[in-house]
């Protein structure tokens, strides 16, 4: 099933975030998405891309926390052969891969100051320079960045470039945690339950018993929608009698 079908809810804060994404999508300006883990930051990036004029160009994703600091710049901006130990051949970076499309940078706060400086140049001038080269390469990339860090506080401490934060904040979309999305636990529980039941080829979805539904709604869900989805899918998979709630 398509990932964007999981992007559902009825709470005001959630719908406001979706509306802001829809309104910003047609533009090529940077967007900063703020939210806890599991709230759907990557889904917002996909929505921004698919509703834009770049929809048929690449959507390239990079998790800035998934690589050691020594490799992040080479991964983002590419490198020439011999630029560092192990670089046996030239390689394009994520910016070049995303040319004419969208680059989604998750966990933005993990970027080193050196990588932030290079990123700022890419945003301001539309060009990148591979590691080991002095030749700038023109790129046309729309940037969507995401974080759960307090970037303004990091900027005050000198841990994040204030000028980069300003350039990436043309539109800021804040995704609410599931615990404050009134009514959405029930909506999502039913959706994930029905989807898993269909995958198991049940002829009907009995739903959860009222006391179970209350427990689900009372839980704080620190892992947000991702945690809820995993819990519901496992529960349905292990269901003893699909005829009974």
Question: Which residues does each predicted region cover?
Answer:
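AAA+/SF3 P-loop NTPase mechanochemical coupling elements
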Residues: 60, 90-100, 104, 112-118, ...
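Short acidic-aromatic loop segments in the C-terminal HATPase_c
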Residues: 109, 124, 169
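Short gly/ser/thr-rich secondary-structure transition/capping motifs
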Residues: 82-89, 125-130, 153
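Conserved post-Walker A coupling segment in P-loop NTPases
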Residues: 6, 19-85, 96-112, 140, ...
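Nucleotide-binding/hydrolysis machinery
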Residues: 2-6, 10-15, 52-57, 131-142, ...
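Conserved ATPase "switch" residues in P-loop NTPase domains
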Residues: 25-26, 123, 127
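Conserved phosphotransfer active-site motifs of two-component signaling proteins
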Residues: 66-71, 90, 109-111, 135, ...
């Amino acid at each position: 099933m398509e990932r964007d079908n999981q992007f559902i809810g009825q709470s005001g804060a959630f719908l406001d975030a979706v509306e802001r994404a829809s309104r910003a999508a047609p533009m090529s300006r940077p967007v900063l998405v703020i939210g806890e883990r599991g709230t759907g930051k990557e889904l917002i990036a996909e929505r921004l891309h698919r509703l834009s004029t770049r929809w048929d160009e690449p959507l390239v994703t990079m998790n800035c926390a998934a690589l050691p600091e020594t490799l992040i710049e080479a991964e983002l901006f590419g490198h020439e052969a011999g630029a560092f130990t192990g670089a046996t051949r030239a390689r394009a970076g994520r910016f070049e891969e995303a040319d004419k499309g969208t680059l989604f940078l998750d966990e933005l706060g993990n970027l080193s100051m050196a990588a932030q400086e290079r990123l700022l140049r890419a945003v301001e001038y539309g060009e990148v320079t591979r590691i080991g080269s002095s030749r700038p390469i023109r790129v046309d990339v729309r940037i969507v960045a995401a974080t759960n860090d307090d970037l303004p506080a990091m900027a005050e401490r000198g841990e994040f470039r204030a000028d980069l934060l300003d350039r990436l904040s043309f539109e800021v979309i804040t995704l609410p945690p599931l615990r404050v999305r009134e009514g959405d636990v029930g909506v999502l529980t039913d959706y994930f339950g029905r989807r898993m039941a269909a995958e198991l080829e049940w002829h009907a979805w009995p739903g959860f018993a009222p006391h179970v539904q209350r427990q689900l709604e009372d839980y704080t869900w620190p892992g947000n929608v991702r945690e809820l989805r995993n819990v519901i899918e496992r529960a349905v998979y292990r269901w003893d009698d699909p005829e009974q709630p």
